[in-house]
Amino acid sequence: MKTLWKHCHIASMAHGKYSIIEDAAIVTSGALIEWIGPQAELAEPEHDNCIDLGGAWVTPGLIDCHTHTVFGGNRSGEFEQRLQGVSYAEIAAAGGGIASTVRATRAASEDELYASAERRLRHLLKDGVTTVEMKSGYGLDLENERKILRVIRRLGNTQPVTVRATCLAAHALPPEYADRADDFINHICNEMLPALAAEGLVDAVDAFCEYLAFSPEQVERVFITAGQLALPVKLHAEQLSSLGGSSLAARYNALSADHLEFMTEDDAIAMAAAGTVAVLLPGAFYFLRETQLPPMDALRKHGVPIAISTDLNPGTSPGLSLRLMLNMACTLFRMTPEEALAGVTFNAAKALGMSATHGSLEVGKVADFVAWNIERPADLGYWLGGDLDKRIVRHGVESSI
């Protein structure tokens, strides 16, 4: 079915810029964009349906390219403890921190995990998100990593959103592998990843390269295994220290390296050469009250694509609004509204290996877009919270969230 969407202004985000088209129209054919441009240039169209967007600003559907949406339990109690003066070390010694999320996730059924994740996902969808990445990493054994990834696939099959599943088994050491990191990496490479990939549950492989997680040498073994399984890689890197993880990611042509507060200019040069996207996570920066800013000047100087994401997770970024992250990126990292919007559209699609089909409004791409009742595109990163008036279109069909 062909639909004409008329009477709008468009920030198409082609090439990562606003690429504004005033007084515009879009023609969709099924799930794809067939024509886009100034309405005055549109020949008398043949269409089955005509929708007047009432002068709205249209952007690509937002893409949340780094989330940990599926988990059991809730760590708001720890949040309260920390603000009462209890240290993270004390919380961890008492069984809190990531260990508590692993226990809760292992104890939860697949249906329970689905129900809680679906509630969180709904908040993102109401914010204009049409594509989301979700990671495993709170199971840390084959049975429970499989359970999380099955929930992720189920969410993608039942909710009005495109979902990419990332296996983050190399997230932390499970209790049964305490002080045996190399053995756990062997287990991931020899058993977990091959089994999960064979079941079709994995779109990409991630790891956490940090002094409190896994070394670059251990991460490299995970990357080698991912390559043997023909799976692209991503990496949590340089969040708390500089270990060269982002350069390692670049050597393996990673889709993205994420966090990056402690990355160096040499890391930026390597990422630019590899086309690896820098995914910045202002929610975690804010929630942890970090002070080391990502090296924005180096990223810009060397042309590293920059994406923004919620990092939705129970411990360090319980963020349910991607639009709020736009404001945080502008305010905390001094990104421009145009850069920030590119970070949740054009560059976010790159970070998921989806730039051929998603991330900008161009002929032949998937017709995922949002018609916002705003005065200008910068409004998306300006307003703090709230539910902006909008119409969400996914695969050429208006979606009711």
Curated annotation (Swiss-Prot):
Annotated family: Belongs to the metallo-dependent hydrolases superfamily. HutI family.
**What are the entry keywords?**
Cytoplasm, Histidine metabolism, Hydrolase, Iron, Metal-binding, Zinc
The family database entries (InterPro entries) matched by this protein are listed as: Amidohydro-rel (IPR006680), HutI (IPR005920), Metal-dep_hydrolase_composite (IPR011059), Metal_Hydrolase (IPR032466)
Q: Which residues bind Fe(3+)?
A: 66, 68, 236, 311
Q: Which cofactor does it need?
A: Zn(2+); Fe(3+)
Q: Which reaction does it catalyse?
A: 4-imidazolone-5-propanoate + H2O = N-formimidoyl-L-glutamate
State its Enzyme Commission number(s): 3.5.2.7
Function comment: Catalyzes the hydrolytic cleavage of the carbon-nitrogen bond in imidazolone-5-propanoate to yield N-formimidoyl-L-glutamate. It is the third step in the universal histidine degradation pathway.
Residues given in the record as N-formimidoyl-L-glutamate binding sites:
138, 313, 315
| Protein name in the entry | Imidazolonepropionase
Starting at the broadest rank, the lineage of the source organism is: Bacteria, Pseudomonadati, Pseudomonadota, Gammaproteobacteria, Pseudomonadales
Q: Which PANTHER family match?
A: IMIDAZOLONEPROPIONASE (PTHR42752), IMIDAZOLONEPROPIONASE-RELATED (PTHR42752:SF1)
Q: Where does 4-imidazolone-5-propanoate bind?
A: 75, 138, 171, 239, 316
The record's Gene3D superfamilies line, in alphabetical order, gives:
Metal-dependent hydrolases, Urease, subunit C, domain 1
Q: Name one GO molecular function term.
A: imidazolonepropionase activity
Q: Where is Zn(2+) bound in this sequence?
A: 66, 68, 236, 311
NCBIfam families cross-referenced by the UniProt entry:
hutI
User: What's in the GO CC field?
Assistant: cytoplasm
Gene Ontology biological-process annotations: L-histidine catabolic process to glutamate and formamide; L-histidine catabolic process to glutamate and formate
Where is the protein found, in the record's own terms? Cytoplasm
Where's it mainly located?
cytoplasm
Q: Which domain of life is it from?
A: Bacteria
| Pfam families in UniProt | Amidohydro_1
